Amino acid sequence: MRRFALAALAIASLAVLAACQGGARRPACPAGQVCLEYGNESDPLSLDPQTSNLVTESRVIGDLMVGLTTEAPDGKAIPGMATSWEASADGLTWTFHLRNANWSDGRPVTADDFVYAYRRILDPKTASIYAYLVTILKNGQAVNDGKAPLSAVGAAAPDAHTLVLTLEHPAPYLPQLLMHQSFYPVPKHVVEKLGEAWVRPGSYVSNGPYRLVSFHLGDMVQVAKNPQFYDAAHVCVDRIDYYPTADVVSAERRVQRGELDINTTFQSNRLAHIREVMPGYARPALVQATYYLSFNTRDVKPLKDVRVRRALSEAIDREFITDKLQRAGQKPAYSFVPPGVSNYAYGAQLRWAAEPLAQRQIEARALLAQAGFSARHPLKLELKVANATETLLLAEAVQADWRDIGVEATIAQNETQIAFAAYRNRDFQVGAMSWYADFDDPVTFLGLLKSDVGEQNYGDYKNPAYDALLEAADKEPDAVKRAQTLKRAEQMMLDDEGMAPIGFSVSRSLVNPKVTGWEPNPLNFHRARWLCVRRS
């Protein structure tokens, strides 16, 4: 009964909140132009492709910039700045042929802009969270560790329209990986002149379908069509206004009133209501994403104990969370790699996954007792979450599950930017996370828990044997053997309770039926260059 009361309370509180919310009116669109009003959950912290790390940032940056490859409407890799490429027989050398293209200030985009960008992101002074992706380039890790000069990075520009990348190991998924913002070029001529100030409106120079017009924190990021873009003739939307919409119920009402054309999320347990009052707007779709709990194993002594981590994970009623609380198509997760990822051999899962919840609760209490906790000396933890309503409801369900095994958990809710700053600084005990695939390969998930990844291994999970398996997979040329090695690595991490998977996500976008070109895809990429808005 406690669980159903929690779900009912959540729905009732959301209804009250929705009734109290207002919202700004839709801004005027110049005559003859197409404008897109876009709810984007939170403000970007950075529009620099090499220092950004949030999904909300990548949405905007991905409309401003284009890498060697880019996303088709279905999320697959297609030519971007590169018109073609070929790989050597050993898979270690890739040659890319660049198109004639300009930056938004009219200067040509050259291969040297890419070389400069890759050296910049790997420079230890940049302190990029995503540098670990670019360490796939030859000597990338040594450069990022400060043990080799920037010139050692495996990227060369024989001429203005040829880029040669040399890799540390074969990577058949490289065209997918190169869509990621960490591999975007930056305008060398601007960054060298302005430094970090290059990202400000009036200074920002882009090579993608849009250019930056304004950025008002807490209000709006505005971009306009870039006439210098190589495919500008086929870009429909002239202006995009991105709004922070942390209050998803308020954003839902704004979409309903026509003030927003898109909001990138909605409250899961409101799906049936939305479908009733706004038919055709809700676009739930399975994506390559997992939400999970991260345990701070560096600073929190009890969480260094695998028995405690297992107890906390075993006690979570995943089916209640996905089927009763969320109810938008999420699936319970007993592994980290979600369904549908290419190049993988599925089968790894938490060893106790098939046990009924009651049995798991008994085991969890016993494990806590073995670790020295009791009713007189209960385990006390803080669960830190971002301020999204969805995440708070999840946290409350986990809190209740832990109470059932004698764990006293408090919830600390912070603004998204503050929460992630705390995660990066390891200023948390347990954190509620989610991870959307950066590219279609299991490494985008399993690599997060590698010891040398850095800040995004939020819990500082360290297991040399796990690292060794991932490194062996990197060097394995046989695709089947590589997939099996990655499966062994995931099973090892799950046996060690390196994190607690909770559910496999669905994208939950609200899209006005007047918006065309929005295609569901596993990576949840929806670049604005493919969208249009039908006039009434």
Question: Predicted regions span which residues?
Answer:
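Extracytoplasmic/peripheral linker and loop segments enriched in polar/acidic and small residues
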Residues: Q21-G23, A156, T322, L357, ...
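Structural transition elements
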Residues: P332-Q370, A388-L393
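Alpha-helical secondary-structure segments
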Residues: T110-A117, A160-T166, P170, G208-P209, ...
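Gly/Pro-rich hinge or "lid" segments in bacterial periplasmic/extracellular proteins
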Residues: G146, A160-H161, L167-V235, R239, ...
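Long beta-strand-rich cores associated with HINT superfamily self-processing modules
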Residues: S509-S536
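Surface-exposed binding/hinge segments that line
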Residues: D113-V115, L122, T126-H189
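Ligand-site clamp/hinge motif
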Residues: G195-P201, P227-H273, Q399, E408-T410
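N-terminal lobe/hinge region of extracytoplasmic solute-binding protein
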Residues: G39-A89, R119, S203-S206
